[in-house]
Amino acid sequence: MTSHSPKLTPMFEQYMNIKAEYPDALLFYRMGDFYELFFEDAEVAARELQIALTCRNPNAENKVPMCGVPHHSARSYISQLVDKGYKVAICEQMEDPREAKGLVKRGVIRVLTSGTALEDENLSPKAHTYLGALCWDKSEGAGGFAWVDFSTGEWSGLQSRKEQELWQWVQKMAPRELLLADTLTPPASLELTETQFSKVPERAYFDYKRSAEKIMSAQQVAELGALGLENRKELVRACGALLTYLSQTQKQDLNHLCQFKPLNLNRHLLLDEITERNLELFRRLDGRKGKGTLWHVLDHTVTPMGGRLLQERLKHPWREQAPIDETQEAVSHFFAHNTLRRQLREALDTVYDIERLSTRIFLNRATPRDYVALRQSLKALPAVRELLEAPQTGDGRYATPEEQLGAALPPFLHRMLKSWDDLADYHDLLEKALVDNPPHVITEGGLFRQGFHPALDELMDLSEHGASKLHDLLAEVQQTTGISKIKLGNNRVFGYYFEVPKSVSEELPDTFVRRQTLANAERYTSERLKELEEKLFSAADKRKTMELKLFQQLREHVAQARPRVLFMADLLATLDHWQGLAEAARHWNWVRPVLHDGQDIVIREGRHPVVEAVQGPAGFIPNDLRIDDQRRLLLITGPNMAGKSTVLRQAAIICILAQIGSFVPAREARIGLCDRIFSRVGASDNLAQGQSTFMVEMMETARILRQATRRSLVILDEIGRGTSTFDGLALAWAVVEELMKKQQAGIRTLFATHYHELTSLEGTIPGVHNMNIAIKEWGGEIVFLRRLVPGPSDRSYGVEVAKLAGVPQNVVQRARQILELLEQKSKADGTRRPASYHEAQPLLPGMPEPPSTASAEPPQTVTPPEPPVLTALRDLDTDNLTPLEALTVLTEWKTLWGAGKNEC
């Protein structure tokens, strides 16, 4: 609205005042049975929702764009907007319009954002939806990153002195919404296409003192140390920002949040986002989810909670032996007992997402159907318990009575059943209270069963059987008066009445009161008719009012069960996770691996689970692999398409599966526990940030060399490509040396390369061992055997692969001629490859000859003085150079060099 706009009506003045408080949100403004949007909000909503855009005051000079949606169907429209990244502020009528004096009071009751969604329409069932907050204090040289799944109440975080590490965790956790101080800018290299960034005032959101107070209040603790937050100032600030944002958007207490647990990196195998992407754990290399990922092969869970737990385990595998052993024991049990596993899957399949259901109930955001879903889920608890309690035999059968005498439950089941809670009291309450198919909206009524509440029963009887009660009263009057011609009627003026012909009207008792005289009839009422009429007219309203009151009481009672519900949700998720791993192992014919504290990794007939799932078992060639003290770095050579990358990836995936407690795709596996797995596989240009494949490769390699330890597993594929042959060879050589020098005995590494010169490192550098992917030549063609065998590959077969790829025959033939000439030349000169363009050029007819120097005098050899800029570069202390100082030095050099001055 501009300054010269006409005076606002009271309603628009109210709207504008509320809108001013939420300028970045679409304001859904309740007016009667509709939510209305005005001005720019209306234009955006109409465009995104494909609904009609109209205008208020169409005949006025200043028309107001508007659109609206019915309140009973607004949820789907709002969900669409939230999915598109919009914030939506819900402005409700805060009083009954019929009782309002003047303008109805209105206020925003909630702001919906992509990171605070509670509705199923905005949530992925088997994935967490995170709201994140990141802060970085340059003066302290430290920062914090915290995240919360508001739909379940789980939250965690970490603190680091490396800003890059924090952003790596942001990429790994991939929050739907990320809170950043308005002074902080994300790095240009950050790839988060599905994350919405929300800038907030640093002082209001990230203040340490306020954050500490909010955390202790929300978690009901007296000190931060109770949550593991002592001496973690930056993590406290990040957590405080989350709580501030949630309080402002949700407009209520945050008592549903679980106890905060800082992420303990020492307990988990660390997989950064780059490794997740290269190994295609959750997404394919093209960014798509589903088929072609490890998740698609592994996920056999049947509940949303079990699916989310599997995702969490796959993102954070265990590094400790104890939880791995317990998971393996459970998976082995369900793997061996097929009948139990099948029946358990059937029982769990009736369980809804009780984690998220309990959150919606606790926050008063649940619909009646959510309560019915909770009831249905609680009904499954005794059935699941009985399945687990039934003794099993070793061959997968239920034990006979005689066999049960010596049968004992596995320790993991005994511990679980000891704390089992059927929640029978809450199931029985919900069963007694709610009908089987209640309406979606509370205000529609018809929620409760007959017999739940006596007063409600009477109102239900009146509202549902009013017509029959009127008919019964009429029959009774006809019988007692003996006048069969009495009729029952109704109109807006007099309501219900008895109509009697004038000829018999005098026969009516005095208890009947005349209401209206017609030409041939008289209309009467009676005390009983008036009483019944009053009850009928008010029954529907009274029933809705009473149902609302009873429903609120039911909500408060069920909300108290949240801790018990969450405890059982965790048990059910764990059961589902275990049986899902067992189902996957049965389906794909996997085996139980042996994990140990040593360094050896021994895999017999290992398979890549995703490739095998696509090709089928018959089409996949398994491979053996061994890493030990004498074979720390396997140098794998062979042509493209032979399967080097598959061997690398499958080794890493088998280690990851083993450390979540899963069976693995192999005939046998012994895995020395890993602390980190690094993967540098595949080309990954980052053109948007001006980073070539080679630059990205070098950055990832540098990170690996800095962070890998003796307990890490590193897989590297084609290090050094993307630059000149000898540059690439030199870099690959140096990387191998560095990997074997680090951590005394070297880092466990699988190193695939086309640089055959590197094969000479076996015997030169302890721990380097040559392997190759076998090839067979047959009738001038090559056959990929897909077998990993000892020794180096004899050559790269690049021309043969080009032929298989469909390169035109004339190009292939010419390539063979050139290759033969190059090889002859290199043998004659005693070198592996031509050392320069001048050596290679005469072998390539059609290329211009280099300038002739035969008749020229031999050039005088003069050593020029070292340029001052090179001297300055050598003297530069890069370890202690600040970014500002570096920029200043570069500017000075550019000024000198750009001017063409000889002195530089």
UniProtKB/Swiss-Prot annotation:
GO cellular component: cytosol
Alphabetical GO biological process terms: mismatch repair
Pfam family name, one: MutS_II
Binding site for ATP: G638, P639, N640, M641, A642, G643, K644, S645
Molecular function (Gene Ontology), one example: ATP-dependent DNA damage sensor activity
UniProt-annotated stretches for the region Disordered: 825-869
This protein's UniProt keywords: ATP-binding, DNA damage, DNA repair, DNA-binding, Nucleotide-binding
NCBIfam families found in the cross-reference section: mutS1, PRK05399.1
Function field: This protein is involved in the repair of mismatches in DNA. It is possible that it carries out the mismatch recognition step. This protein has a weak ATPase activity.
Family of the protein in this entry: Belongs to the DNA mismatch repair MutS family.
Protein name: DNA mismatch repair protein MutS
Taxonomic path: Bacteria, Pseudomonadati, Thermodesulfobacteriota, Desulfovibrionia, Desulfovibrionales
